[in-house]
């Protein structure tokens, strides 16, 4: 899944709050086991433990023990409060993307560079939830005259995906409803 690869590129720019939302979104999208959440979000187990604890403390997820063929397994589920949080945060991110798109469409290169710089930490979350139109996003870099890898220069991990042509097919897959709802 290309948006996951994109998150790896931008992972170091993600704020703690963005990681919380991405974990919540992954659980909401059916990734309910610890190891799978860690893989899907590219968040190390130690850090993921803390995030899950925080989400549980805030009442956004519930931890359930299920009996399976191989013994007990822990399953995580999003609560109604957690679902409301996802909807609200996705709405905010859609607003940020809309602003970014409007600046791009205005043709103001300097303003676009400034807004991109200011919103850098939100970009992975926008990508994870399918808010970013990848074609337009790449055209923004063209307008600024820089490559994505230059914009995120210095990111030691995941840069091999920076110019992945496959990313452009992630598109805006019918996300008028916010994607994961």
Predicted regions and their residues:
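Membrane-proximal interfacial segments on either side of biological membranes
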Residues: 131-140, 144
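N-terminal leader-region detector that preferentially activates on the first domain or presequence
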Residues: 1-126, 142-181
